[in-house]
């Protein structure tokens, strides 16, 4: 499933802007509500999650065992038999919960994606304004960097899943949803400066990809976190400053937001 990426449309901006002496002025806006998690039914042949407590514990044992083995042995070396042995269950029992090893890894990926999405929504709850965009950007990078560091033990699994056909689709869906969230979060400031909806979407896409590029290989130590967070913030701040400066060029206003 592909997530339909929104543009920074005029309707969503009206409540946060006003026209004063021929200029669009950005006003404070209400906090954004969390967006719906964008991944649905992306895992082929997914088994129903059990409701009995004992079965839920067994399922969790399998996921934890797969995660530990992937960290210690490498994702490509793991088999269902190894996962079952680590879980202290019969191999046949493992197959009652998951079709194969990749189905287990996909479940771990989705757990990570759910946590990623919750962290992103929390960090992008307050739309940008002229006075707050720097602190908002700093807060986002700080929170996302911390998330990546805390989930570093899963990174080999995440990269593996995203190399598969289904995983590539899931990754693209998350990326599109991330850009859409940025359109709601950062977009009103750029729209108030006169950028079109398409231009706004392009800027938000550039910001998302710039930040994402700093985490693409994972974050494994606090030192890496500090270094990557600084370069991510420096790079995106420079982009925003350039875009806002260029937006100072005169634009015609005809009574409607442009």
Predicted features by range, described:
Residues 107, 121-150, 203-204:
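Hydrophobic alpha-helical connector segments
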Residues 55-67, 83, 108-119:
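Generic hydrophobic, amphipathic alpha-helix propensity
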Residues 1-57, 246-258:
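N-terminal intrinsically disordered/low-complexity leader segments
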Residues 58, 101, 108, 112, ...:
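Hydrophobic/aromatic residues within well-ordered alpha-helical segments
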Residues 189-236, 247-258:
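Hydrophobic/aromatic-rich alpha-helical bundle segments in the mid-to-C-terminal region
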Residues 120-128, 155-165, 214-222:
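Secondary-structure edge/capping motif, primarily at the C-terminal ends of alpha-helices
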Residues 61, 69-103, 107:
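Helix-turn-helix
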Residues 117-121, 146-150, 159, 166-191, ...:
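Amphipathic alpha-helical packing segments from all-alpha helical-bundle domains
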């Amino acid at each position: 499933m592909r997530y339909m990426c929104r543009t920074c449309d005029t309707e969503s901006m009206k409540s946060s802007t006003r026209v004063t002496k021929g200029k669009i002025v950005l006003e404070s806006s209400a906090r954004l509500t969390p967006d719906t998690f964008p991944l649905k039914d992306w895992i082929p042949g997914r088994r129903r999650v059990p409701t009995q407590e004992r079965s839920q514990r067994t399922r969790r044992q399998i996921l934890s065992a797969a995660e530990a083995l992937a960290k210690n042995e490498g994702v490509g070396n793991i088999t269902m038999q190894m996962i079952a042995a680590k879980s202290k269950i019969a191999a046949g029992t493992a197959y009652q919960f998951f079709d194969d090893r990749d189905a287990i890894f996909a479940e771990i990926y989705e757990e990570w994606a759910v946590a990623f999405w919750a962290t992103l929504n929390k960090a992008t709850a307050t739309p940008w304004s002229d006075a707050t965009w720097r602190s908002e950007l700093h807060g986002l990078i700080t929170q996302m960097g911390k998330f990546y560091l805390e989930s570093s033990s899963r990174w080999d699994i995440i990269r593996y899943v995203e190399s598969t056909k289904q995983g590539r689709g899931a990754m693209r869906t998350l990326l599109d949803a991330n850009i859409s969230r940025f359109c709601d979060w950062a977009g009103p400031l750029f729209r108030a400066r006169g950028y079109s909806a398409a231009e706004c979407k392009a800027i938000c896409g550039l910001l998302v990809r710039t930040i994402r590029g700093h985490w693409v290989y994972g974050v494994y130590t606090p030192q890496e976190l500090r270094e990557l967070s600084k370069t991510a913030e420096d790079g995106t701040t420079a982009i925003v400053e350039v875009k806002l400066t260029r937006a100072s060029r005169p634009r015609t206003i005809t009574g409607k937001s442009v």
